Structures are given as C-alpha cells and as structure tokens.
Design a protein with these regions (language model features):
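Helix-rich C-terminal "collar"/helical-bundle subdomain used as an assembly and partner-interaction module
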Residues: 59-174
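Long, charge-dense, solvent-exposed interaction surfaces that engage phosphate-rich ligands
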Residues: 1-49, 54-57
C-alpha cells in the first residue's frame, strides 16, 4: 500500500487505475511491491524524491539516469526543478523540526501536509538525516540558481539540470 501511494500520490483516479492494472497483472491475486516498482505509474514528485535519495546516497550516476528518463518523458525542466526544490524544502523542514525537538506530526500540521504524511515525512526524515543544515541550505542555493538559469539563460536546459545534480552531490558532501 505504501509503495503504491509513494509512487502515485493520493490521486484517487490514478490509484484506482493502478490497482486495476496491477490486479490484472497479478491474476487478481496478491500485488507485490516488485510489481508496483516495475509497472506502477510514478508521479513527478515521487521520481524527483528518488533522485534526491540517489544523490544523498552518492549515486549521482543513477540520479542522472533518472533525470534523463524524466526529460525523455517530456517533463518540463522547470517542473522537475520545482519538484526538487519542494523535496529539499521538505528535508530542511524535517531537519529543523528534529533539531527543535518537534515531531513529524507537528511538521505535517504546521505546513499543511495532508493524506499519508507520516509515510512521506518518515522517508524524508531518513534522507534528511544524511545532511547538516548548512548542506541543505547550499543545496537550496544550487536549486535557486538552477531555477533562475532555466528562466533566463539561453543554455541548454538538460545541461543545466545535469550540472545542478552534480552540484547537489558536491553540496551534500561538503
């Protein structure tokens, strides 16, 4: 259940379609996590969070590959960047809350996270634990610059995105 929500979000129409598709694949038996991972539709937010986790784990090559896939699927670079920014802001919020001895429930309430926030913020907390506050601030600066460059530069957006992923990897290690 959590894997499907993680990949599809809370869109009831999308969830119903995914469950129908996966149920047919399983012969109307048990739907496994492997089936969800292999064939489940993914939202941009889920894909970009996967990219963040890959970068945080030092697997930049795989993050670059996921970026190439997102771009090949005609996702707009500015939308990918916005989703990345959202994911890094989530990590910053969770990290600051932890430093202030506040719970994930407090974060969810304070920032209006709805639905299955406990799973989402729990995953965010695990990823954020690899960072110090200054590293996340540097990552947000990298993404702010990327956003500005995508909106104003004549340079190739794909190259700007690839460069930013490398800079995020470096910022997360400094």
């Amino acid at each position: 259940e959590a894997a499907l929500l993680d990949r599809c979000g809370e869109d009831q129409f999308l969830l119903k379609n995914e469950i129908d598709k996966l149920a047919a694949l399983s012969g109307y038996g048990t739907i496994t996590a492997e089936m969800v991972a292999q064939l489940g539709t993914v939202t941009l937010d889920a894909d970009t969070f996967d990219m963040v986790k890959l970068v945080a784990a030092g697997r930049t090559d795989q993050a670059q590959q996921k970026l190439k896939t997102l771009l090949a699927l005609q996702n707009e670079p500015i939308m990918i960047t916005g989703a990345l920014i959202g994911n890094y802001i989530d990590m910053y919020r969770v990290l600051q809350a932890k430093r202030s001895r506040r719970s994930l429930a407090d974060v969810a309430k304070d920032f209006g996270y709805g639905g299955k926030w406990s799973y989402r913020l729990g995953e965010t907390e695990r990823t954020a634990s690899r960072f110090k506050r200054r590293q996340l601030e540097k990552c947000l600066e990298v993404l702010q610059k990327l956003d500005a460059d995508l909106k104003s530069s004549k340079l190739d957006a794909d190259l700007l995105m690839q460069k930013a992923l490398c800079e995020l990897a470096l910022a997360g290690r400094s």
